[in-house]
Amino acid sequence: MESQYFLKIDAYAHISPPKYTDVLRKEYPGFYNQILGTCPPLFDMPERFRIMDLYPGVVQVLTVGPVPPLEAFADPEKSVDLAKLANDEMAELVAKYRDRFVAAIALLPMNNMDAAVEEAKRAIKDLGFRGIYVHSTINGKPLDSPEFLPLYERMSQYNLPIYIHPWRGDDVAEYPTEKTSKYMIASVFGWPYETTAAMTRLVFSGILEKYPNLKVVTHHCGGMVPYYEQRILQHYGSHERSGRASYPKDLPKSPIEYYKMFYNDTAIHGNTPALMLAYHFWGADHMVFGADMPLGDHYFGFRSYRQTINAIEAMDITGAEKKKIFADNALRLLRLPV
């Protein structure tokens, strides 16, 4: 069906810039052959635009993906070079195709924190980027590790968001008697868990309290959090009352209040009941349109865009709230001049 809401800002669209992709193809062929080589719209702009043209009004905020985290395959020096290459090229694409790409989110060398803070500054101040992109775990370290605090402080000062993308490789087995994950469990079910774990570390570490201006955007609609709202309330509450709580009890807000501070995209492939669950937890103001384009879809985003747009249209909410999800929230969150 044709949407009545013309402007739709895909706030979490994935891309692998062509020059950056060429480097990965030559220097990291395993990653290229596994994912990038099977998904042309990541780096083939005409093919990408062909899909976008099927959905009038769709524009994109660019995020690099979906190879494993930069720090997982590049050393601290090389990751700086690759991050700069990707960010420079995304800036060129935004400048060249302003009617397609309204902004970009910076890739950072997270295994080199001094350089990551400087690259965030360069990307935002010099290139005009509207946020930064990190994974749910940094080479096995949680996001509340003290070494990452300077980056959070800087982003709080910029008043621009941190995008969290889940990561759990197939080398992380579900059972200690096995060496690898099977049946795509790591990504299909592990990624929502990793998102939830990262959110929880940010909540209970006090980072969201320490930096109240910090804004965090999750992928795939906030992982498990909205589904487990009552479990969060009951278990954390009962453990605190019984004296068995293993988390700080001096935070001024309840845990659920901190979870409600996150922003979340709609990239769950068109499930209206699940979107309504997220809506009841976060409200329309903390949801942004996203379809995981061009991933998770054998048609490289064609099906996911259709499913996601139709699912939002079918939500039992007001037209003004749908408009917020499709565009207004991204305009506000990213401070876009569209």
Model segments located where?
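Short glycine-enriched loops at secondary-structure junctions
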Residues: 15, 65, 110, 166-172, ...
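Catalytic pocket-lining loop regions of alpha/beta-barrel enzymes
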Residues: 124-288
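Surface-exposed, active-site-proximal loop segments in enzymatic domains
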Residues: 66-80, 114, 183-184
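Short, electropositive alpha-helical surface patch
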Residues: 64, 77-80, 116-128, 217, ...
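Divalent metal-dependent hydrolysis catalytic cores, especially in the metallo-beta-lactamase
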Residues: 32-41, 47-74, 101-109, 130-134
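Aromatic- and glycine-enriched glycan-recognition loops and surfaces
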Residues: 38-46, 84, 88, 141-152
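A short acidic, glycine-rich active-site loop
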Residues: 33-42, 80-81, 186-195, 243-246, ...
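Mid-to-C-terminal alpha-helical segments outside catalytic/metal-binding sites
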Residues: 1-11, 16-59, 88-95, 118-122, ...
